[in-house]
Amino acid sequence: MDSAFFNEVAKKWQEKWENNKVFEANPSNSEKYFITVAFPYTNSPLHIGHGRTYITADIVARYQRMIGKNVLFPFAFQFTGTPILSISESIKRGDSDIISDFINLYKISPEKVREFEDPLKLAEYFKEDMKRMAKALGLSVDWRREFTTIDPRFGQFIKWQFRKLKEKGFITTATDAVGYCPNDNFPVGMHDTKGDVEPEVQEMDVIEFEGNDVVFPTATSRPETVFGANAVLINPEATYVLIRGSNWVLSKEAFRKLSYQRELVPEREVQGKDLIGLTVKNPISGKDVKVYGSKFVDAKMGTGSVMAVPAHEPLHYLGLSEVLSEVEVIPVISTEGYGDFPGPEVLALAGTKNPAELKDYIDTLYREEYYKGVMREDIVDLVPDYMRSIVKDRIAGKRVPEARRETVELLRSLGKHDLIYEISNGPIYCRCGAEIVVKVIRDQWYITYDNPLWKSWTMKALDRISIVPEEARRDMAKAIFSMKRRACSRSRGLGVKLPWDESQIIDSLSDSTIYTGFYTVAHKLSHDPSKLNDQFWDFVLLGNGDASEVSKVTGISVEELKDLRNEFSYWYPLDSRHSGRDLVQNHLPFLIYNHLAIFGESLLPRQIVINGFVRVGGKKMSKSFRNIYPLYKAVEEYGVDPVRLALTISSELLEDTDFDVNTVKAVTDQLRRMYDLAVNLSKLRENESTGLPEKWLLSIIHYKVKEVSDLMNSLDLRKAFNIILYEYYEILRDYLSMVSNPNTSVLRKAIEIWARLISPGAPHIAEEIWHIFNEGFVSLTRYPVPEELEVDGQAVIQLEYIRHLINQVKEISSMANKQPEKLIIYVSNSDELGILRAVLRGLKERKNLRELSSITGQREEYLRSLVERVQSLPPILRELIVTYPLDEFKTITDNLNFLVRRLDVDEIQVYRSDEANAPDIKGKKSNALPLLPGIVII
């Protein structure tokens, strides 16, 4: 039984589900559950990272359906934005890597790949490919409601949303510095870059050092140190450009980047080595300083020149010491824990001249000086007389943050200050391959996520939403708190045109904030898009207006309008939104912001579920890294249900996980065992004999059903399916080891319950097993509840004690690295069991050792040992022993045959620890405690 078997089973049941419209959902009198996933960019196949998110959501959808809710799980496709455009243009440019992936990895013909030069054909192809894969994965989707973001009806919906945002003052135009692709010519965000990195734009201060016909605009993040600047450093190997008008000297790389921020006209080029030796003035001190060459200057950073402050910057000291026999150091900041010259001090401490190895030391120095540093009083002596009173009053003796602000103001008043922008977390590359630059864009449309009232409203709204897992809430709050206004349109690409500026396309993170509302009516919108005007959406989504009046304006009947309104009112709000962790920084906050703005607090999503990434070879999987593991490949190789469960049980929800072949194979083997067990059961002769093993089996399943249900409700899916897949099977195996002729009715009931439990995670094999004994779809049966099974506490405590004993023996054998042939077991007397019961009752009542000693009459040392060891007992034993009697000696002797078989030993001898004539082998006789026998392996 290999992947072919599982995939044949999957195909069979997927066809039956589709033919019977099993997952189509309509408003009813039942409690509803509306669940969605972040829709995918249609620029390549679904990969196992998508699979993890979609499978998690599908498990929740199937579980909620089985507990009686009317579940809507729809699906759609994102055509908007640069991910599609950049792939299309890469193919047009003949990008050999991307074309090779499409042909060799994704198995697409070269002729078809050439068609992808048209972005719409690319998107349409992968939309159909993704839909096939989503169906093959067994997602319980209502496919009537699918749409794409370039559907004209969806476009009308988004235009309505944007007009609402603009009316409320949440959209504005502004001039701003943004991450920008110089090749594609539009602003970029996380989804546009290789590695999905959000460009972070940082302001850098520029201080002008002026000479004869040249000005070196030195870029710095620490302008307050200009008092100690005694040189300008450039890269001698770089080419520089003299700028007409300003006489700025910029590296060629800086000239290219800064051309996106300001008007720059080149005068001429000059080699860095030819600039060495020039004299310029420090604008604060007025002193002449020299220009020196240093290999430590990165011509790509800032302006390509830096002011050298060797007293406070190790690399500046290092650079100057390579060209000067003696380096002058001028201290300007005093910091606790450092001497007068922290730059050379840190260099000596680090014991290296490697910039990469120095980075942490330098970062620490910068941080310490910023938060703990104070400007020295004697900096007054470094400036001209006319400036001294200003420096004394505003800068000298001040803490660094305040001094920084005042220094910038002073430089501005001198006309020697400017600002540029840099990508602080660069270099970052667009998906097209170009390095991202900062561009100052004028008259760009922005959504004002930095609006203080809107942000405060959103922060408060977060408290109303369940975040799963809860530890992700802090990251969500941090993302909202840090939110800045965001460019919401582009000049190119697929998507919806901005309603008041048709030269602009709404970007992919702005048309995907309330689209979940569109699902509720998408399957009923066959109308001419022009009819879906603002009055239509106001009525259907907000309940505003009169149906008769809206009908007159739109030509849509009153009955249809009311039906559409009923669809939305029934399904909204969203009950559960599922996405990967990467969307915490953008999409998920945007979702909350926009729901508040459009629908208000009452229609906020009730729950947001966030999962970690799937790694390949230890690295985050990303289309831009070209390390995608396509979902179809995993399914072809291992089968649908094994892949579904492997992705579910491999890690906790928020943790990243590696797609582990060994895990998939283990899941495959376990599913095969359960299937074989069901098939073999169907061939057994009927047997209704009932004894202790049958009572135990049904009782322990009662407890497992309760445990699994609690875990499913809290979305602890990893633990839930590990219990269903492995612990449940061990229970069945133990039952079969206990009896020579199993009760077929009891065993059938146990397997049917297992099929219902596993169904949300492995729905296809669950249907196959269910149909060995039953009609109908297991997907539509009720999820098991504990009340289906009676509990015989006496049977449970006896056989759980035996199973725990088996585990103890296995642990001892494993530690001894020995397979025993014979066992000697010592059990404690019944009086000690009474002490244990009293201790467990006391612990439930939170009594301390002194109180327990008073209750039991036992020494605290003995009780401490008992409490420590009893923690190793299974919870069910600790719970039941308080209520039910247990004769350990009799229980073991009654089940000796089972113990011999399960432990594969030749002989087991059992003694009471208080039996005077019992031999004391290896001192284990006195080691016996209640429920914790002394065990000797031989």
UniProtKB/Swiss-Prot annotation:
InterPro entries: aa-tRNA-synth_Ia, Leu-tRNA-lgase_arc, Leu-tRNA-synth_Ia_arc/euk, M/V/L/I-tRNA-synth_anticd-bd, Rossmann-like_a/b/a_fold, tRNAsynth_Ia_anticodon-bd, Val/Leu/Ile-tRNA-synth_edit. Gene3D superfamilies: Class I aminoacyl-tRNA synthetases (RS), HUPs, Isoleucyl-tRNA Synthetase, Domain 1, leucyl-tRNA synthetase, Valyl/Leucyl/Isoleucyl-tRNA synthetase, editing domain. A motif ('HIGH' region) lies at residues 40-50. GO terms for molecular function: aminoacyl-tRNA deacylase activity; ATP binding; leucine-tRNA ligase activity. The keyword Ligase applies. Keywords: Aminoacyl-tRNA synthetase, ATP-binding, Cytoplasm, Ligase, Nucleotide-binding, Protein biosynthesis. ATP binds at K623. One of its GO terms (cellular component) is cytoplasm. It holds the Pfam family tRNA-synt_1. It is found in: Cytoplasm. Its EC number is 6.1.1.4. GO terms for biological process: leucyl-tRNA aminoacylation. A motif ('KMSKS' region) lies at residues 620-624. Its main location: cytoplasm. It catalyses: tRNA(Leu) + L-leucine + ATP = L-leucyl-tRNA(Leu) + AMP + diphosphate. Transmembrane segments: none annotated. NCBIfam families: leuS_arch, PRK12300.1. Belongs to the class-I aminoacyl-tRNA synthetase family. This is Leucine--tRNA ligase 1.
